Design a protein with these regions (language model features):
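Amphipathic alpha-helical extensions and coiled-coil-like segments
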Residues: 109-118, 139-238
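Short, charge-rich amphipathic segments
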Residues: 1-7, 39-50, 101-123, 184-194
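Amphipathic, charge-rich alpha-helical segments that serve as recognition/docking helices
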Residues: 24-26, 33, 68-152, 157, ...
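Short, solvent-exposed coil/turn linker segments
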Residues: 8, 13, 102, 221-222
Length: 238
């Protein structure tokens, strides 16, 4: 893909967009709300990136949150930077823009999976194209493969953070998959802070099988009871 020349930027209809890579993005409801508020006040500041796909249609490459925010503002059009070329080359280019775009770990992994599985690029080829080591590519692909589709969907919906998925749920899944499934379902309904998850995982690792089942079945209640015990112990010490 030739990125040396100037690319056309123009307003296009949102209805002309193919959201082909929506499954590789996290929805981030709070970020969408903040973007919508910004658009209402200042308009769309940065164009999204699209790839021409025929005379009147475009594949959305980057800018999924902006499109969601524009829809929330009841806008019908989006300012877009129009690229020409192959989709895999466009995906490689946005991944290579490490300094201008901060990716979530799972979003990166999902795009690498597209390049590897859908476009049949080898890990070494991908690494060379995005300017990374092969171990960087293989590590992210392995991480993505280790997560169940249900868990990935929870991450995409913003119900579970990438940190919780990779640092807590994935290690549990490697040992006892049903515990990971139960915990992820409960965290989707009642999220915990990073600090609470660290504490929960610490106690889970030390617990026996029966205690672990109780922890994953009711994580919020477990932490509430733990906090109550700690307060009672402190009160006795006074």
């Amino acid at each position: 893909m030739d990125s040396g020349g100037l690319r056309e930027v123009k307003e296009i209809e949102i209805a002309q967009l193919h959201l082909r890579y929506a499954h590789t993005r996290i929805e981030w409801p709070q970020k969408v709300l903040a973007l919508a508020n910004s658009i209402e006040r200042f308009g769309q500041i940065l164009p999204v990136i699209v790839l021409r796909d025929g005379a009147n249609s475009f594949v959305l490459i980057d800018g999924y949150l902006r499109v969601k925010a524009l829809k929330r503002c009841l806008r019908d059009t989006v300012m877009a930077e129009i690229w020409e070329g192959k989709e895999e080359e466009a995906l490689v280019e946005i991944l290579a823009r490490a300094n201008s775009r901060k990716w979530d770990l799972l979003e990166e992994a999902a795009l690498l999976r597209e390049l590897h599985d859908q476009y049949h690029l080898s890990q070494s080829r991908i690494a060379s194209m995005v300017g990374r080591k092969q171990s960087w590519v293989s590590g992210r692909l392995a991480l993505y493969s280790a997560l169940s589709e249900d868990l990935l969907e929870s991450i995409r919906k913003g119900a579970i953070s990438t940190w919780a998925a990779t640092r807590v749920i994935a290690p549990i899944a490697r040992a006892i998959p049903e515990h990971a499934k139960t915990l992820s379902e409960n965290l989707s309904k009642e999220p915990l802070s990073t600090r609470e998850l660290i504490l929960l995982f610490h106690h889970y690792q030390k617990a026996n099988r029966k205690q672990r089942e109780k922890i994953v079945s009711a994580p919020f209640l477990f932490l509430k009871a733990l906090h109550a015990r700690e307060e009672a112990t402190e009160a006795k010490a006074l």
